[in-house]
Amino acid sequence: MVFSAVLTAFHTGTSNTTFVVYENTYMNITLPPPFQHPDLSPLLRYSFETMAPTGLSSLTVNSTAVPTTPAAFKSLNLPLQITLSAIMIFILFVSFLGNLVVCLMVYQKAAMRSAINILLASLAFADMLLAVLNMPFALVTILTTRWIFGKFFCRVSAMFFWLFVIEGVAILLIISIDRFLIIVQRQDKLNPYRAKVLIAVSWATSFCVAFPLAVGNPDLQIPSRAPQCVFGYTTNPGYQAYVILISLISFFIPFLVILYSFMGILNTLRHNALRIHSYPEGICLSQASKLGLMSLQRPFQMSIDMGFKTRAFTTILILFAVFIVCWAPFTTYSLVATFSKHFYYQHNFFEISTWLLWLCYLKSALNPLIYYWRIKKFHDACLDMMPKSFKFLPQLPGHTKRRIRPSAVYVCGEHRTVV
């Protein structure tokens, strides 16, 4: 079949469109005079084997294949932008102030510098840095619907994000293992010095894992299809291996270890509760005349000690549950986006990314609220630091406050605290 092609006159200018064609076509072509100039052939990237005013000629089109990339963002409607921005502002405000108060309490008050509280302060410090170095830029990206801070800071922000995330997970893992050793193995090995050493090791390890993102290895897509640089679809085996590695370190391995620890703790608490309830009260009464009241103190002391340990375990369990709810969706999303081209290039990927990132950031805001709710020392210290004009919450009268040291009742080490 013979086609007739009519070419319009040549107009100078630039074009950002790349046409990818792989064809061998036979055309009946009559070129206008403007196209017969020899200087125009490099611009057209056409190689003409034969050309004649009339008759059959051969046209070979050679070009380089360039994959088409969909638009970076799908524009968010105004109500959704306002909603997401308001949520982000609330999370940013609570995360920064709440975790700052936790850090200041541990730093300023010597009584708060127990091993567990030092670990919680490190977790709060990581959450506070996440609020300062990541959340504001994600908020600006939501308002502008595009990343405006350049390629270098996009990579650096991705490094900060995973650095603080891995550090927070490491602290939660250390606390869970410590609870397991205390309750199940009855080994109380953690002290403030060892806690500081573990914190230093965890920060160094987290930095080593996250640093390759800052130097472009793996090379993230910029601009990203999310409010910040995230993992995207790729066929690079090294890129895919890094995503799997960071997912294992930041979620799956800690999840399995913490879950195993909590199952062991639950089993131990169940056996101890049965032993306490089955303690023969008659034996205590029969021995009272010989041993005084010491025999009567044992079941009471065991009950109080188990109540302390159970409350401490419950607090860590709540932190673990919040971690799972906030991070499981984002971890799954990162893996699917890396290996599924269809998922990564779908039209609402930006909106999905935003909601899942906001859920991750929500964990940083919930942690200080959990400390305030569950840990009495943090609750009291927070009220003491608060100016009198801002103390709206009702407080117990002074004569009803506990006046004895918790260690006197709970029989804990001096470096322990009520968690």
Swiss-Prot record:
Glycans are attached at residues 16, 28, 62. Expressed in brain; detected in the frontal cortex, with lower levels in the thalamus, caudate, hypothalamus and midbrain. The keyword 4Fe-4S does not apply. One of its GO terms (cellular component) is plasma membrane. It is a multi-pass membrane protein. GO terms for biological process: G protein-coupled receptor signaling pathway. Orphan receptor. May play a role in brain function. This is Probable G-protein coupled receptor 63.
